[in-house]
Each structure stands twice: as structure tokens, then as C-alpha cells.
Amino acid sequence: MKKLLVSILASLFFVSYANAGPSLSGLYLELGTAAVGVEMDGNFNDDDGDISYGTVGKTAVTGSYGLGFMTSREKPISFDLGYAVTPGSAKIKATSDNTATDVTMEVSDGTEWYVVAMANITEDASVYFKYGGNDADITVTGDINNPGGLSGTTVALGTVMSWGSNMYIRTEAGKTDYDQISATGKGTAGGIGTDVKVTADPTVHYGKIAIGFKF
């Protein structure tokens, strides 16, 4: 899916630029790709009650698609309401000599709803502030309890530039702070004890480019 979205964006980018048309407004479909950096600050509480602290990070390129409604940009201030989906999954795996303590955690199917307030420099160029709510599914395997879904909030700054009469290009840079997640052992024989606990605070920084199509 990610490769398909990137290919579509690349193809559209090299289409001949059309003359600017009327101010964009109404329903739209959007395809985007983002460079993402994930940081997790956390701690590990072992069987002896000792607590270890640490930070891990990872980068990735993701694809997304969304649907939204944009009010007319003919006025100085306009608004954009939307919903976006980031398909795919990412796995974190921990193994040891004792296979009974092996654990895999998978985060998948990220979603976001958002509200955007735009300051319109012209009918074809806008800058904006975005606020959004984010959710993702978490699946675990191994002798550990599922910490539940992942939820958070996003703040971002961006630009929207009209491209022809019914398309636009969006650029955006933002940060998503997820709620703290915590998982404990199930305590099965030979597995992970119930007094073992892992806690993490995930944060995502990203830069995004997207192309939108007005219906």
C-alpha cells in the first residue's frame, strides 16, 4: 500500500501544471506520504523491583489516505475537517533464551480525525494550524497482557497550495503525543511474572506531503 501511494503521488507531481481555477471548497480525497520519527521514553520494572529507564527511537516512511471537507478560501479565515487512515503495521519483538518469555507487540491501522484553521494569504495559498485525535490498534503475543489501544493528540503547522482547478498540494510538519501505555506479565508458569511491568510514552514527529482531489 505504501509503495502504491508513493507511486501515485510521484506520477501526479509530474503532470503538467494547469492554470489556477476557482477557490477550492467542499469534499475532497487526499493521498499522502510522510517521513516519521518515533521516540519512546519508558521504564522496565523487573521481578526484583529494580527499575530501569531508557529511550528508543526509529524512523520510517508511511502512506496515508483521507477524506474531508474544506470551506471556501475566498475569506481570510477558513476551516478544514477530515479523517485520515494510515494502513499497515509495525512490530516490536523481544526474545530471550527462554522462549516462554518471548513477546511481540504489533501496532496497526492508525487513524486520525482533525480540525484545521486556515489563514488564507490568497484564494490559492493558505497557512494553517491543525489539531487532531489519533488512535491505533495494539496486538500482543506471548506471556504479557494487552495494554489496550493507542490514543493521542496531534498539533501541526502546514500550507495548502491550489494546483489547477480541482487539486491542491499540502505540506505539514507536526508532533503526535500518545497516552502512556503499560503492560504487565500474565504470570503463567515459566513465563513473565505479574510483577514485571513495562511503561512507555510514545511521541511521533513527522513531515508530510499530500495531494488532494476536490469532488
Go through the PLM ranges and name each one.
Residues 1-26:
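Cleavable N-terminal export/targeting peptides
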Residues 74-79, 124-127, 164-171:
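Repeated loop/turn-to-beta-strand initiation elements of outer-membrane beta-barrel proteins
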Residues 32, 66-70, 116-118, 158-160, ...:
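Transmembrane beta-barrel domains of outer membrane proteins
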Residues 33-39, 71, 83-91, 109-111, ...:
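Transmembrane beta-strands of outer-membrane beta-barrel pores
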Residues 39-51, 90-104, 136-149, 181-192:
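Outer-membrane beta-barrel translocator domains and adjoining extracellular loop/strand segments
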Residues 28, 161-162, 201-215:
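Outer-membrane beta-barrel "beta-signal"
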